[in-house]
Amino acid sequence: MWKGGNQEAVIEGSGGELGVPGSWGLQDAACHLARASLPIMFPWPLPLGSSALTMLLGALTSLFLWYCYRLGSQDMQALGTGSRAGGVSGMPDVCSQTGPRGLGDSGEGPRAEGLVSRRLRAYARRYSWAGMGRVRRAAQGGSGLTGGAGVMGIQRPGLLFLPDLPSSPFVPRDAQRHDVELLQSSFPAILRDFGAVSWDFSGTTPLPRGWSPPLAPGCYQLLLYQAGRCQPSNCRRCPGAYRALRGLRSFMSANTFGNAGFSVLLPGARLEGRCGPTNARVRCHLGLKIPPGCELVVGGEPQCWAEGHCLLVDDSFLHTVAHNGSPEDGPRVVFIVDLWHPNVAGAERQALDFVFAPDP
């Protein structure tokens, strides 16, 4: 006996007739359910028997699948609206108290924790929550979004802090041995590409094709990837650099944290202290032209580039860049690539690519 409100549906063995006024038989209950909920109508009443029960189960299954489809469609529509309104495309913002943004950082990103959480839930429905503990904690804001509580002092990522990642201002090259060796072996080709797109950096207006407006006086960049998007015209002009990027195993190329390109700093130029958007990435600097007097300070630790060699930096730490050389020394030029932090697992990378995917 099935009770619904104050009515009883009495299931008879063969006839399925109404027992008393106000009671439903199996046929009437199924007919009411079909008329009220299903987008596809079936002829009713049906003769009771194995075929009728099969059709009833089919109708209930159709109703369940239709409900799941509607729920998923509404959720994805909400995500799309939030993405356009919140500016998910482009590089997430950096620390509000810092200076100019770094290579490729456009200052755009999800403006609210709710949007990131909704995207993560959409990912889990499509795939799984397995291995998502740290990402889930970050998305819920416990340690994670916009720096979060517990990220103190010199490490303050502007958007996403993934908890429990080993961190230090400079990362050993062995942590990304394959990609470091590939980039260093590609040094001659990448240097030739820079020579093909270089100019006198005299502040000409408009800028030569492919070059972005200066981040600060004396600081220029030409990007092959910006915020997870390939820049086809620049890639065609730099075939050696593009070929090297395609061979990397840990290149962060599919989300808004990922950039790659040439960074030029003129003598006397300086980028004041700032923090990158996340600790889930490591920036690889390949030195191309390094005159005297150039310095990179990350988390209070000074370092200098070397031509033909890579330097791995966790730019979620507060860092400054300066070229203290003379005008005769020429510009400092490095090729910068954003790589995944080596301790971010494959499942976490896939989830972050989904959550922070650039808009089409």
UniProtKB/Swiss-Prot annotation:
The keyword Iron-sulfur does not apply. InterPro entries: Asp/Arg/Pro-Hydrxlase, Asp/Asn_beta-hydroxylase, IPNS-like_sf. Its EC number is 1.14.11.-. GO terms for cellular component: membrane. Disulfide bonds: none annotated. Residues 69-360 are lumenal. The keyword NAD does not apply. Keywords: Dioxygenase, Membrane, Oxidoreductase, Signal-anchor, Transmembrane, Transmembrane helix. It is a single-pass type II membrane protein. Residues 1-45 are cytoplasmic. The chain crosses the membrane at residues 46-68. GO terms for molecular function: dioxygenase activity. It is an enzyme of class 1 (oxidoreductase). Its main location: membrane. Pfam families: Asp_Arg_Hydrox (PF05118). It is found in: Membrane. PANTHER family: ASPARTATE BETA-HYDROXYLASE DOMAIN-CONTAINING PROTEIN 1, ASPARTATE BETA-HYDROXYLASE DOMAIN-CONTAINING PROTEIN 2. Belongs to the aspartyl/asparaginyl beta-hydroxylase family. This is Aspartate beta-hydroxylase domain-containing protein 1.
